[in-house]
Amino acid sequence: MDDLMLRIRSRFNTTLVTQQEAIRFLLRKYRSNEQFLVGFISDQRPNSQNLHNWTQFLHQDTAFAVGGEEIGKHVNAHYFFLHVEKPRRGHYVMTFKEVCPQDDKTKFPYTLQYLRMMEENIRKQPELWLWSHNRWKFNREGKAIH
């Protein structure tokens, strides 16, 4: 499965960067003054060592990762959500929508707004979300639920 995902995600002249390499890679790109677009796969749960930030998501107490927002602050990023629709079999319509927080008094306003947008997208077409990555594996105490 990893090889398949790597092959799919590395088409069209894209560069895949591991989580460990991300900050150095992005700072290098930013300092070079060249324009670039970065996509984070942000719908998955954080690992058990990063269960610090929680919100309600799909009526569940849910941990969320904030790395994309934290890194974005260092490179003066604009944040976008990739809205996906499937009008018919084999056809997908993808639209970039700017993430504009409604409440920027929270600690991670862009991440929380992104989660609201993702939740809306999932509610409209739940069959498009990959449910197999066990989003709710841990509780707030870091204990495995399942």
Where are these regions (language model features)?
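Membrane-interfacial amphipathic helices and adjacent loop/beta segments
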Residues: M1-E21
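Non-catalytic C-terminal accessory region of glycerolipid acyltransferases
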Residues: Q20-H146
